[in-house]
Amino acid sequence: PRLYCFLDDRIQEARQEASSHSEYQRLIQNAANALKADLTAIGNPYSQINVIKRYVQSLYQAYYLTQQETYAKRLHELLQLLLNTPVSDAVLFADNFGSTNIAYCFLKPYDLLYKRLSSEERQSVENLLMRVLRFYYPQQQGTQENRIFDNHFWQQNLRVLFQATFLLYDNEALQDEVLPIMEYYYELWTARAPASGFNRDGMWANGTGYFNNNVYTLFYMPMLLSHITRKDFLLHPWYRNAGQALTFTCPPESRNIGFGDNSEKYTTSTYQYAAFADFLARETEDGYAGWYARQAAKTLVRDNDMRLYRMASNTLSYGTELPADCPK
C-alpha cells in the first residue's frame, strides 16, 4: 500500500503489539460495525456515501494493521457495491466534498487490495479517479494558488486529489497526464500550506471552529511528502509554533478564545485538537504539544482519523511537562 508508506518502518512492530494497544478495541469495534452492515439494504450507495466512507476507513485501518482476511473481504465487497452502481456526472460532481468522498471510497480499496483486484476492477477505479481529476484540476489550476483560502479544498479535497495522483502517477497509460497534476498539487502545498503560505505563528486564521476540519490533512500531507522527498516538511515555522498556539488559544478542558465560525460550540478541547497535539509531540518533540496531548488524553482516543498512525507509532514517546520557559 502506498497511502501510508510513511509508516512502512513502523508497521511490522505495530502489528505484533496491536492487540495490547489501548485503542485496539475501538479499532476492532469500528471494523465490526462495517462487517455487520447489511449491504443488501443499500440500494444506491452514493446516496449513503458518508456511511460507506466510514466503513471503508474502518476496514482499511483494521486490515492494514491486523492483516485479517475478513476485513479485506468486506472492503472488496464495498468496492464491488460501488462499481456495480454506475455514478453519473450529476451525482459525482454535485458538490466537491461529494466528489472527493466518492473518490476516497474508490482509492482506499484500490490501494490496499490492488493485487487481488481484477484488471476490470482496477480499470474501473482508475476511470473514476481520472474523471474526478479531469473535472477539478482545470478549475483549480491558476485559481487555488491565487485565492486566500478555499475551505473545502484545503480541508479535504487537495489531500484526496493528491492521493489519487499518487496511486496513478506510474500507470503507463496515465502517467503523462497524471504527473503534471501531481506536480501542481505538490507545488501548491509547498507554496500555500499549511496556512495560506504566509502564516508562521501556528494559529489557524480561519478560526478555531474550522481547525477541526483541517487537522487530518495537516497531519497527512507533511508526513507523506516528507517520506517521498526525504525532506522534513514539519520544519515549517507554522508547525513549530502550532503546539504553543493550541495551548494558549484552545486550552484542554476549557473554552477556546472564541475566534471564527462555530467557535462558540466548543466548551472544551476537541478530539481533533488532542490528536493533532499528539502527532506534533511524537514527530517534533514539541513540549507544548506533549503537555496538551497528556491533558486531553481521554478526549484523544475518540479520534478515528489518526488512530492507525498512533497505533503504528506507539514506540515514539514524548515529554508531557510544559516547557520551563512557558510564559505565565
Question: What are the language-model segments listed below?
Answer:
Residues 1-2, 6-9:
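N-terminal carbohydrate-binding accessory modules
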Residues 206, 210-328:
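Extended polysaccharide-engagement surfaces of secreted carbohydrate-active enzymes
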Residues 9, 13-19:
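Extended, small/polar residue-biased N-terminal targeting/export presequences
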Residues 3-4, 15-17, 24-32, 36-250:
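Aromatic-lined, polymer-binding surfaces characteristic
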